[in-house]
Amino acid sequence: LLSHRSAAVFHDGIRPILPQLVEGHMNRREAGSIAFGLSIGFVASVGISFTLSTGLLNSWLLFLPTDIIGVLAVNVWLAFILGAIWGILVFTSLQPINQLLTSLPVDIIGALGELSNPVVSAFALFPLVAIFYQFGWKQSVVAALLVLLSRLIVVRYFPHLFPESIEIFVGMVLLLGIAIFRDLRDRRTSPTGEEASAPSMFEERTQRIINNLPLIAVTGALISAVASMKIFGGSEVSIYTLAKAYAPGISPEESDALLHQAALAEFMRGLGFIPLIATTALATGVYAVAGFTFVFVVGYLSPSPWLAAPAGAIVITLEILLLRYIGKWLGRYPCLLYTSPSPRD
């Protein structure tokens, strides 16, 4: 429903094309073909491999196909029915497929887990690639050394933390810092008119997201509820830790420690990706299905779905209400508008 209404999608690469669909510059078949091309590779390589190797549902397997379904569907009811069918199909087929693969003489599930390792590492490199793409090799080399240093510190002194989540956070902070420094340096020569025009554009786009707030809040509630049911892992930095926490035979104390470790890794990843998600939302008027992904953290730490659902709805609502203030702050640093799409590219 969210993707059909162009209110929110999971894939950041799809969000910039949805305004073209809303404004009538593109039909659903064209937009759907783009969405399919951008998403199908992640579904096959990340979504399926993560789920089969951990036994947990994940965002890529659930939300990327529903992005495609919603964009292609000709009406709301068709989008709702097909999306529901996909969710039921994925949920009911997970256990039989897992049993089939474990019965084979070859360890396919272990191989799929190894296949996903480079994907996890690649996510951590996104900010560094963005710095190189936007600001050149000198800044990217310095940033790479700082990110490497942060990884060494985490591995050496904080082995309970997921190093890739810290790498993403440090990399995005460096990306933000370099962009803000560039704006402050160039502010004296920049015309003030450009700075004033950005907030007005953000205000218009933010209002479109706020108009879809009830549906987005319901989605946030459902995501948090599912994340609390021990069948779902939100992202690459938490899903394998969650699989260990939910494994049979583990003590409650060890499970709680792993859950908090997964929640912390997810929280750090969410902080790192706030600039990308927020600026894309403000520029397009299309939000992310899971928001800043803090609804995952709420679900991991909630003792029951009944507590997770209202908490998730509140969290994603607060995120949307804060978008207006984030837009005003970002309007002071126009360079961030050009920097934030670089990780997505």
What is each of the regions a protein language model found here?
Residues 1-49, 69-70:
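N-terminal signal-anchor module of multipass membrane proteins
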Residues 48-58, 109-121, 262-266:
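Structural signature of hydrophobic alpha-helical transmembrane segments
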Residues 338-345:
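Conserved small/polar residues in nucleotide/adenosyl-binding loops
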Residues 80-89, 141-150, 289-298, 336-337:
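Central hydrophobic cores of alpha-helical transmembrane segments
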Residues 1, 168-283:
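Membrane-embedded hairpin module used as a gating/binding unit in multi-pass transport
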